[in-house]
């Protein structure tokens, strides 16, 4: 099942810089692992925002939630999930 996921990162101002840099490095590694596994299909930065739009290919809502909650920056994200369905006019 495909999902469009928007992730807006909202890091509190009182987070130590070194801790935040470690979180970003861990986040990058986790995101790349999921991309290599074929789960995180697409990843785009949203211009002008600390945010991204991504496409995930997972079994169901529970699997998606489980994966998103493993992201190191998850506690600092506002996440919007949109399940996707095949469009009848799409050319494959």
Locate the predicted segments by residue:
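Conserved, structured core segments of small domains
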Residues: 1-92
């Amino acid at each position: 099942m495909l999902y469009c996921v928007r992730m807006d990162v909202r890091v509190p101002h009182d987070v130590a810089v070194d801790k935040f840099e470690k979180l970003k490095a861990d986040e990058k590694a986790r995101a790349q692992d999921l991309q290599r596994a074929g789960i995180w299909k697409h990843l785009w930065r949203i211009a002008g925002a600390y945010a991204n739009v991504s496409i995930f290919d997972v079994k169901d809502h529970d699997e998606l939630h489980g994966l998103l909650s493993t992201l190191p920056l998850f506690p600092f994200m506002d996440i919007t999930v949109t399940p996707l369905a095949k469009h009848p006019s799409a050319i494959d």
